[in-house]
Amino acid sequence: MSHPLIKPAKIKEFACKQSKYSIAPECPFRAIAYGPSGSGKSVLLQQLILDVYKGCFERIYIWSPSIDIDHVWDPVKRYIRKELKVDTKKEKCLFSTYNPKELSEVMDRQFKIADWMKNNGKNVFNILVIIDDFADEPSFTRQSKLLHQLYIRGRHAFISTITSVQKATTLHPLIRSQATHTFTFRLRSMQDLETW
């Protein structure tokens, strides 16, 4: 008895900018940074933007309650203004509170841009969405359909997403299962490790 030869049909492939480090996750990625307070998650996010993925993203959008008070974000803000040449007064990309309308607008715009670029060439712009420490808003981290969409469909629009949390249980299981990469810091209990 013969077996069918299963091979995918040829389709148009698209490219995007990648990290200069071969060990870094390939864009677009869906990641979770996971560790207790003070473990270094924000420093990791800063270094991913300023070194590991420098020059890979056309836009960077950050949702963080501490975006205006944590100085670790200052070099990132300068990078967005000076290197990416974003006028942050005209084009908002740093958010201290979660408003679903703002995230929806970012996603809709990127889906349209990616669709146009796919129809007109081979290379597509990447964007990065960072959700940093919204554990005190479970309506966002556990119930936001938009956040779920980033982890399910964001890759089709070349949206890389990193969600940073102190406890994995603050994230919906769908997000945990769809993450392509995790950055796990030293955990404080066996229960945290067993969550995965």
Regions from the PLM with identified roles:
Residues 2, 10-11, 89, 108-116:
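Intrinsic disorder/low-complexity detector
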Residues 9-12, 32, 61:
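Small/flexible residues
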Residues 28:
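Short coil/loop residues immediately preceding or within conserved phosphate-binding loops
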Residues 47-98:
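Conserved nucleotide-state-sensing and coupling region of NTP-binding domains
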